[in-house]
């Protein structure tokens, strides 16, 4: 009896050791999932992306064939994106429409361009802490059902935010 009891406690010890390892693994997995949530890089229309205190929200998207004075190339269209930028960091930040690109459904990526203006074109500048700016950026792209706006704040930085537009 004592011998059987000893064997039983040995198995319990092994079992509880395994359970402790499983709990530790789950805790590590949960932390991994939390990190993945914090590093979200894809957003939709009216969703705010936060990259080191720079908050960007794409609030509107319009497609245009231009006006009587300016038209896109044959097979292309203008995509006019309205966005808000807000500085939630404790230092000045810079912003520039050249930090934004558009990608069409074929994977072609293009820079902003001159197009039909609505007098609210986003220029470049700086924002102090809690500063805000909004404006439009015009892109010319091959006609596409879907677009993505890509934001890369600095060319030497590998951080990128994507806004999926429908």
Task: Please identify what each model-predicted range represents.
Residues 2-166:
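Conserved functional micro-motifs across diverse proteins
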């Amino acid at each position: 009896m004592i011998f059987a009891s000893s064997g039983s406690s040995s198995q319990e010890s092994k079992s509880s050791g395994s359970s402790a390892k499983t709990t530790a693994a789950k805790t590590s997995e949960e932390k991994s999932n939390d990190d993945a949530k914090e590093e979200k890089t894809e957003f939709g229309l009216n969703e705010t992306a936060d990259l080191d205190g720079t908050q960007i929200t794409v609030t509107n998207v319009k497609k245009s064939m231009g006006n009587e004075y300016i038209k896109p190339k044959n097979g292309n269209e203008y995509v006019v994106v309205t966005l808000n930028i807000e500085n939630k960091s404790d230092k000045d930040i810079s912003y520039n429409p050249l930090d934004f690109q558009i990608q069409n459904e074929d994977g072609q990526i293009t820079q902003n361009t001159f197009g039909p203006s609505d007098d609210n074109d986003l220029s470049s500048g700086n924002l102090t802490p809690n500063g805000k700016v909004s404006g439009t950026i015009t892109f010319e792209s091959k006609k596409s059902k879907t677009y993505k706006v890509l934001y890369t704040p600095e060319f030497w930085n590998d951080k990128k935010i994507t806004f999926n537009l429908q």
